Structure formats: C-alpha cells, structure tokens
Amino acid sequence: MLNKNNTRELAYLTIVDNVTPIPGYDRVELAHVGGWTVVVGKGEFKPGDIAIYFEIDSQLPEKEPFTNMDFLVKKKLRVKTQKMCKSTSQGLLMSIENFGWISIIDNEGKRAIADPLTKKRHYPDDESRFLTEILGVTYATSQDNARKAPSADKYKKMAQRNEKLFSHQPFRWLMKRDWGKKLLFLFFGRKKDKKSAWPDWVHKTDEERIENLPYLFNEKTHWIATEKIDGSSTTFSIKRGKGFRKNQFYVCSRNVVMDKPDKPCFYDNNIYLEMAEKYHMEEVLTKMLNKYPEADWITIQGETYGAGVQRRDYSMKDHDFKAFNLIMSHTGRWNSEHMKEELENFYHIPCVPILDLDYTLPATLDELREYVDSEPSKIDNQMREGIVFRSLDGVRSFKCVSPNYLIKYHG
C-alpha cells in the first residue's frame, strides 16, 4: 500500500473483511483483507477484527514475535506469495496482541490500537496505520532496499559501488557482521557518498496494487492496459536552464540519482546509465525541450530489464528499456497511446506494450487475474508478470500482478 508520499508501506493496520473455510482443511481458513487472501489458523481472526497485515516482499526483523513462529523462521522471515492448502496466500496477518498492543475506542468513538508503554495510538483508516518503520520491516530483496529506500547508509553504498566484489561469499559473510562492515569500510569506504540531490519535480514510480483498491470494481472507468515488466524502475529527466545556465539532466533509479562517471559516487555497474547512453536520452530530452518551448522540464520513466536485473530475464543476455511515463511540466502525464506515438515514432524509444486501449474492469478480482494470466508476455512469449492500467487522461493508474508469476519467480 502506498502512503501519502507515494512510498510503499509493507506493514500496516487493517480490518479483516471476511474469513472463509478452506475445503478439506479443518485447522486453517482463509482471511480476506481488501483483495488479499491469507491462510490463517482456524478461529484466529473474525470479520471486523483489527489486525496487522504484512505485504508480500516484506523482510521481517530477527526478533520476537516473528522468531517464535516456526513457519516464518523456515522462510528466513520473508513474506512472499505461496500456495498453501490449495489456496493462494499473499502476505502475513498477525494479531495486535502478538505485539502487546490493545484495542481501544477513543473519545470520539473511533476504533484504534494503543501501545500500553508509549500510549501512542494507531488508527486503521489514516496515516497512523502504517507500521513499517515502527516494526523494523524492510524489503526481502536487498536490491529493493537499495533501490526503494529513501537513502542508503555508508555500508550499503560501499557494497553498491563494488557490487561484483561484494557478491563473493567472504564479503557477504563480513557484511552480515557489524565488525566486518567496519573492517571493510577501512579499505573500501573512503570514497565520499555525496550523491546529487533528487530532482524535486520528479515523482517516484510506484503503482498501487488493485488488491488495495477494491472499490474500483464498482466503477465503470475506461482504462488503457499495458504490460507490466519485471525489471528496475528508471527515470530520465531534464530541466530547462534559465538565463545562461545549462539544462540539468538526471538519470535516476527508483529513489537514487545515478551520477555520471566524472562524479565521485559513480557506480561501475550501472544499468541506468547504460540505458541513458543506449537511447541517447540527454540528446532526446534536449530535442523535446526545443520542440515544446513551454515546458520547464520533461521526464521519461520506464523499466530496465533483462539479464541479472530480476530472476525473470526475458530470455535476454543483455539489458533493454521500455518507457511507461512521459510527463511534462505544462501538460502533466501523457496518455499511454499518445506517449507511445511520440517516443517511438520521433525518438525511437521503445514503450511498454499496449494490450487494450479501452478496457473496463470485470466484476471481481478473480476475473481480472484471469485476464492478466490469459496471454504471455509480448516481449518473449513467456509468462507475463502483470498489467498496469491507466485512465484515458493519464491521471489515475494501478497494477495487477499475477500471483502465479509471483509464486514462480518471487516465491
């Protein structure tokens, strides 16, 4: 779920919508939270309960109460999509009592939970519901932590700069220990980690999941459906220089500005700069500034994918890029169809495949997932990760990721 800053939260309060039996299994049942289904112990939850939901991709901290649960320890405290008792289970649902919290009714009659020690209250219907930082939850994939975290500490940056070297077992062993990280920092941490500041006009990419937006099934909005690619979010942006100042060009991952080779924090293994050079992004964006003189800045966002980026390599031995956003200061985000026409026809920048130009959501999530799984990827004719849906005006969007894909490639 995304918070008000459009940053993904991995742990948060929720209200259990329903609990249904699993045929043939008497000791467990299926809890329903929004569009998510989670296998839980029988009688553990009932509809209307306030509970804590941990989304898939969560890495739980190595402490109680998580370490008291054998099934979590066997999974190395990682929360992923899995098949359990012939059912799809996505996420983890835990009782507030597991953390020593209590359920209360405040003076205004609102339901909340409270920590008896700090007296702090959390409500399931506002920003206080988010518990990711409080509970110490991070991303299960270390690359995601580097890519999605607001900032990386000096040890992470040290490892990122020397990615190939630090992938070897001795270095990974040392990086798991505080004294080991300090030792390595003496030899590899001298380089300053002062990266360029994030361009404040660029919105970071993260689509909300349909499972957190169940009300959309009651709308008859028309959507443009595009293939979701399993890679790494990549942003290219240029800001027009004022007066005698030069234009400012940026290459970014999801949360980090990737400096050029002449900067002290340049990373040798950099797929983002590789794509910038492959498609001449600075030159393209400069041409677009000239074409649209009313634009103060222009941003192209997309996905870099291929060998070594994710487990799904799209049958490639190298990398490629496909755009999914074209945003200008004076127009906002372009419609997906118009973006494709502009970028591919005039600048030879490939865009994500368009699957449907006028799609209306079916009545249920199960039907939508059937649509997602109905065809293979347009890139290599293998399993498709999911679909991103954008409104015809380009303003609203969400994604539906195939649980079957997650089980195969991220389980």
What are these regions (language model features)?
Residues 1-411:
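Core nucleotide-handling region used for phosphoryl-transfer chemistry
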